[in-house]
C-alpha cells in the first residue's frame, strides 16, 4: 500500500513487473531485473490524501472560554446571511475585474515570459507523460529484452516477425552500440512508433540551447508588444566607420618629446610677406601683426627712408582691410557707406520699402536725404519744412528724376508723391534763365505745368510748392475753375515758372489765348487715372499736343542716357521731361504714357490698386437709409473716433440731408460736392483742417487728392460704384504713416463690387472679412459687365465751366 501511494495515484496504475518467460526446456529462465535500474517515473500527479487510519492524531480542541452564566448572560443573536451584501460584493468584484488595468512595459514583458514559461513547462510534462505511457504499454517480451543485463535479446519468434524496428546501422555497430548503452546503465530509449514507414519525433527530446530560448522570447515580445520602433541609427557610428582604416600608432601624441631637445621645434619660422601677401587661413589680426612687424623692421634698419616706407606699408594694409570688409555680410545696409553697398544690399533695401523698378539704367534709391543729390539751398528748405525721412516713393523717384528720365510712379494715396516731383522740378528750372529776365520770356509761358484732376488737389499742390518756391524766388500760379478769367490773367501778368491747373480750365485758357506753352519743358500729371475717370482724356491730349516739339526726347536708347538728356539743346533749351503719377494703371493711362513718354522708368510702391496697409477695413450689411442713419449716429456717438471724420455718399442731394441729421445729433458738419462754389469748397476744407468742423460729408469729389490731416475715420454711407473709387475714399485716412479705420455700409445694390471688395479685404493684414460677405453669392466670382455708369457728380462739378 505504501508503494502504491509513493509511486503514483490510484488512477494511474503502476508499472507491472515483467512477466515470467515462456517455459522452454532448453532455455534457462532469465534472471530477475536488477533493483538498481529504476522504472520510468510516473507523471506528476497530485497524490491522494492518505487513508484515515494513516493520518496522525488530531490536536485536542481548545478549551472553551468561560461564559457568563446566569440571568445577565446574553444569548448570541443569530445574524442571517445578507443577500444584498453578497450581491454588492459580487458587483464590486465584477466591476474591478472589468475595469482595465494599466500595465507598464516591464510588467507586460514579465507576464508574457511567465505565460511562455508555463506553456513550455506544460509541453515538457506532456512529452514526459507520453513517454511514460509508451513505456508502460510495451509488451513484456520487449521490456525483458531491454532490461536484460548483457543486452542480448531472447528470440521470441521468427526473425522476420522479430525485426519490428527499422535498422539504422550495420549489425556490428548496432550490437556495439546497444552493448555500450547497457554498460552505461542508462535508461533505454522508447521504441519508435511506425507511421507509414516514417519515424515520428514526437516523443524525442533534444536539449534547448540559450540562443533558441532568446529567439523565442523575442518572438513573444514582438507578438504581444509589437515591433520595436526605436531607431538604432547613429550618426556617430557612421562617422566612426571612416576611422577604421586609419592607422593608429602604439604611442600617443602627448608622448612626443622632440620639442624638448630639437631647436627646430623650439624656434618655429614665421612666414613674412611683402605688400599684400597673406598666408592662407590667416585672419586680419594676424595680417596686421605681420605688417606692423615688417614696418618696424624697416624703420629700425633705416630711420628716415625706412620710416617713410613703413608708413606706406601700413596705409596699404589699411586700404586692403577696407577693401576686404566691403564685401562682408556682417553689416546692415543702414550701417554701410554708400560706396560699400553691394547689389545684395540694394535688393534687401528695396524689399524693406516694397520698391520695385523697371526700365533700363534705373539708378539705385536714396537711403537718406543726404544721398539725394539736391543742392545745398534746397536741402536747407527740406529740413526747414520738416521732412525727416524720405518716403518710399521719394526714395525711388527723386534719383530717377534727377537724371532727367521720364517717370511713371505707381503708389497709393498719401505716400508723399507731391514732394517726389516738386523737388526735382525745382532743380530742373533752377538751371534755366529767370523768367522775369526779359519781357518776351514772361509771355512765352511757364517752364513747367502740373495737371491735377480736381481744384482742391491743385490748390493743395500750390500750397505745398510755395513752401519751396517763395524762398527760391520762383513764381507759382494755380489755374482752376470757380475763379474768373480776369483774376487768373492778373495772376499771370508777371509770368510764372510753374503753373498748377486742372485740365479743363487750362484748355480754356489756351483757347482764349491767355496762355501759351512755347517754352514748357517739364510736365507732371498727378492722379492720372483719376483724370481719365473724370473724362479728361481729351483735354489732356490737347494740352500735351500744344507743347513744343523742338525739345522732345528721341524714342531710342539715348532717352535712357542721363548724361545726354541733361545737356542743353543748342544754348538754352533742355529736353522735355514728363512725369506721371497714378494709383492704378488703366488702359487709357497706358495709352497716354506710350504716346507722350519716352523710355520711362516705372517705379511701383507696393502693388498697384491695393489699399493702404495702415487702414482697417470694416464692412456692415445694412439695408435702407433709415437704418444706416441710425447706425451712423451710433458710431459718431460712441466716442471711439476723434474728429475730423469724413462721410462719403454717392448722390449730391444726400449730402445736405445727412449733414442736417449730424447737426441734430450735436456734431458740426459741412458738405463738399459739385454744386458748391469755389469759395464754399475752400471754406469747407479750411474749417475741417482747422478743427472747427467735426464731420465732412462729401461725394467722390473729395475722394482723390484731398489731404485733410489726422482723419481717424472714413464712413462709406453708400458703397462706391468702382473698387478704384473705394480705394481712394479710404485713402483719406491712414496717411503719412498713421493708422485709420474705414467703415462701409453694404446693400443688395452693391453686388457689382462685392467680389473686388472681398479680394481687397482678404489682402489686408489688419482687416477682417465678415462671414456674410464671404458667403455672399455675388462675392464668389467676378461679374462680367461693361464699364460702370458714372454718377453725375463724377463727370462734372456742377459749375458753369464744368471744371
UniProtKB/Swiss-Prot annotation:
Start and end residues of each Helicase C-terminal domain: 614-777
**Record's Gene3D superfamilies?**
P-loop containing nucleotide triphosphate hydrolases (3.40.50.300)
Q: Give yes or no: UniProt keyword Hydrolase.
A: yes
Keyword DNA damage (UniProt): no
In what residue span(s) does the Helicase ATP-binding domain sit? 398-603
Q: Which GO terms describe its molecular function?
A: ATP binding; ATP hydrolysis activity; nucleic acid binding; RNA helicase activity
Q: Which is an annotated Pfam family here?
A: DDX23
UniProt feature, compositional bias: Basic and acidic residues: 115-126
What keywords tag this UniProt record? ATP-binding, Cytoplasm, Helicase, Hydrolase, mRNA processing, mRNA splicing, Nucleotide-binding, Nucleus
Give its localization. Cytoplasm; Nucleus
Task: Enumerate the residue ranges of region (Disordered).
Answer: 1-83, 115-210, 773-803
User: Where is this chain compositionally biased, Pro residues type?
Assistant: 11-62
> Where in the sequence does UniProt note compositional bias of the Polar residues kind?
135-146
Name the catalysed reactions.
Answer: ATP + H2O = ADP + phosphate + H(+)
* Recorded GO CC terms: cytoplasm; nucleus
Binding-site residues for ATP, renumbered to this chain = 411-418
Q: What is known of its domains?
A: The Q motif is unique to and characteristic of the DEAD box family of RNA helicases and controls ATP binding and hydrolysis.
State the oligomer form and interacting partners: Component of the U5 snRNP complex.
What is the purpose of this protein?
ATP-dependent RNA helicase involved in mRNA splicing. May destabilize the U1/5'-splice site duplex to permit an effective competition for the 5'-splice site by the U6 snRNA, resulting in the switch between U1 and U6 at the 5'-splice site. May also act to unwind the U4/U6 base-pairing interaction in the U4/U6/U5 snRNP, facilitating the first covalent step of splicing.
Instruction: Please identify the protein, giving its name as recorded.
Output: Pre-mRNA-splicing ATP-dependent RNA helicase prp28
Q: Which gene encodes it?
A: prp28
